[in-house]
Amino acid sequence: MNQENPPPYPGPGPTAPYPPYPPQPMGPGPMGGPYPPPQGYPYQGYPQYGWQGGPQEPPKTTVYVVEDQRRDELGPSTCLTACWTALCCCCLWDMLT
């Protein structure tokens, strides 16, 4: 392959990216153009509150979360947790010193 002589391009060749635009009529368009009239748009009023035409939301349901079991009592699991914590702290202290 040569930089100065590339292989031929298969196909009809490049074309313009877009067709030319049709001529536009002069003067303002059917609605008076893209700009508002000099006196502004007429007042439409405030929007309605409440029903806006879309689907209504279902009523909200209150959900109460209740603990299954309180763990205020001192039992074997609390003692075991404290022992494991102390053992880990002792091992960590031993490694650091």
UniProtKB/Swiss-Prot annotation:
Disulfide bonds: none annotated. The keyword Oxidoreductase does not apply. It is found in: Membrane. Residues 1-61 are annotated as: Disordered. The chain crosses the membrane at residues 74-91. It comes from the Eukaryota. Its main location: membrane. The keyword Membrane applies. GO terms for cellular component: extracellular exosome; plasma membrane; tertiary granule membrane. Residues 1-40 have a biased composition (Pro residues). Keywords: Membrane, Transmembrane, Transmembrane helix. Residues 41-50 have a biased composition (Low complexity). It is a single-pass membrane protein. Belongs to the CYSTM1 family. This is Cysteine-rich and transmembrane domain-containing protein 1. It comes from Homo sapiens (Human). The gene is CYSTM1.
